[in-house]
Curated annotation (Swiss-Prot):
Record-stated family: Belongs to the DeoC/FbaB aldolase family. DeoC type 2 subfamily.
Name of the protein in its database record: Deoxyribose-phosphate aldolase
Phylogenetic placement of the source organism: Bacteria, Pseudomonadati, Pseudomonadota, Gammaproteobacteria, Aeromonadales
Matching HAMAP family: DeoC_type2
EC number, as in UniProt: 4.1.2.4
InterPro entries: Aldolase_TIM, DeoC, DeoC/FbaB/LacD_aldolase, DeoC_typeII
Pathway where it operates: Carbohydrate degradation; 2-deoxy-D-ribose 1-phosphate degradation; D-glyceraldehyde 3-phosphate and acetaldehyde from 2-deoxy-alpha-D-ribose 1-phosphate: step 2/2
Amino acid sequence: MTDLKLAAQRALNLMDLTTLNDDDTDQKVIDLCRKAKSPAGLTAAVCIYPRFIPIARKTLREIGAADVRIATVTNFPHGNDDIEIAVAETRAAVAYGADEVDVVFPYRAFMAGNEQVGFDLVKACKEACGSQALLKVIIETGELKEEALIRRASEISIDAGADFIKTSTGKVPVNATPEAARIMMEVIKAKNPKVGFKPAGGVKDAAVAGQYLAMAEEILGKDWVSARTFRFGASSLLASLLATLGHGDKPANTSGY
């Protein structure tokens, strides 16, 4: 297997296959779940809005893909600073049966100088997840922009109990970048290597995925990269990976994520 194919296979098994669109329907989520059971193996998870968790769970069981985890989003996509709402949404997501919750850090309040609300929101949402769900914190690096802000938001999220830190919602102009990824993984190495990392948005093909995997191995070691500590948030990436692996043609890109 070539290096590119190896990267494609690894990336596929580390993917949170995502649909987070305003026009999502039960049928679109059913189709997404079927894609998660790909000709080259299972994706790590699907990532969907909370109301679709029951239909996703049912579909994954029916197709023999119950090992695919179900991730959802809260405080999404704007990262508001209302802790009560974020916690209520997170509790509801866990009650629906989410295995993982991707919560948006209150990045605008943080950029305005309020570090405490970020810590408190992440801590409260982690408590709401209990032992039932992993908490991934989206810090929205494309809006933070500055290295110092990306570093500090990563530190606060980890200190507050995040299981993963994630670059982006996919809903702003700039999503995952190698520069932001390096900063975030350096913080993970310094603070707690048990915390995972998820680049989201802008990872379009096996070559780009391979660059992120190589960076993760360089910073945190070859044994660190697994579905427990590394995910790709993506939608259009799957078709490209399957094409690289010899399964069908690469269709047109239909999503910015």
